[in-house]
């Protein structure tokens, strides 16, 4: 099976490197049409089921989240789930590696996005949200050959680990005759990117290692995707 790796013209470094630092303890930090993923309805918080912290973030930034989620074609509750996982709803969260804000934008990513959107201060929560949602859309557009459910999970994995890691896992999945467009195939291939499987890598890549180097953060990335999806599903039930 031959895997077609998309060409990245804009955001090359940002897309490859990702947003979230791998294995980072949150206590240390924190002209073409856009096809819709899911259209967000008006939010109604069921106060008996939603925790106070979530209620507070929706009250403060819900309008901003919904605005940019709709603009870039996402369900706003998915964005809320990403924010919860990234920063635990802490607007001033900052990592040792420099990821900052509600959506934990990494410096390289932030610089590229800020130029594209003419944003001056990504430390402002609303600007940070806009930048993060815009970046998620850029990642989502890389996986147009997958189903929507798989696309969302591949996007989340790329947001966490970088698109380059996901591409390497897709290429390895294809070599193993799995469908590289399915998240389950990529999920199974991610742990195989570590150095302990370098004998396998010699059969896949001319440089005898993954194109973006060995990857030891697969467990964290998989847990990240699982957590965001779990939170998203909960929000779909709790928030209308």
Tell what function each PLM region has.
Residues 1-5:
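Positively charged n-region of N-terminal signal peptides that target proteins for export
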Residues 6, 10, 14, 18-67, ...:
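N-terminal export signals and maturation junctions of secreted/periplasmic proteins
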Residues 19-30, 111, 116-127, 131-134, ...:
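Non-catalytic cell-wall polysaccharide-engagement segments
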Residues 65-76:
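N-terminal Sec/ER secretory leader and immediately downstream segment
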Residues 75-81, 97, 149-157:
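Alpha-helical scaffolds flanking conserved acidic
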Residues 83, 106-110, 163:
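Short, small-residue-rich loop/turn micro-motifs
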Residues 93-113, 175:
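Short, surface-exposed glycine/acidic/tryptophan-bearing loops
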């Amino acid at each position: 099976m031959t895997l077609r790796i998309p060409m990245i013209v804009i955001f090359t470094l940002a897309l490859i490197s990702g947003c979230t630092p791998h294995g980072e303890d949150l206590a240390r930090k924190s002209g073409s049409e856009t096809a819709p993923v899911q259209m967000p309805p008006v939010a109604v918080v069921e106060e008996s089921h939603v925790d106070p912290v979530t209620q507070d973030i929706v009250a403060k930034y819900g309008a901003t989240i919904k605005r940019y989620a709709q603009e870039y074609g996402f369900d706003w509750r998915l964005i809320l789930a990403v924010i919860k996982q990234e920063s635990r709803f802490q607007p001033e969260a900052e990592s040792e590696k420099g990821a900052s804000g509600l959506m934990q934008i990494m410096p390289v990513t932030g610089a590229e996005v800020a130029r594209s959107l003419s944003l001056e201060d990504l430390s402002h929560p609303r600007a940070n949200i806009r930048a993060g949602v815009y970046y998620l859309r850029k990642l989502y557009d890389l996986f147009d050959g997958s189903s929507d459910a798989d696309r969302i999970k591949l996007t989340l994995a790329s947001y966490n680990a970088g698109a380059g890691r996901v591409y390497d896992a897709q290429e390895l999945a294809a070599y193993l005759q799995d469908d590289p467009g399915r998240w389950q195939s990529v999920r199974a291939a991610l742990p195989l990117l570590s150095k302990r499987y370098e004998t396998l890598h010699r059969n896949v890549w001319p440089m005898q290692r993954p194109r973006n180097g060995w990857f030891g953060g697969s467990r964290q990335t998989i847990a990240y995707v699982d957590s965001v999806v779990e939170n998203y599903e909960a929000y779909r039930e709790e928030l209308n």
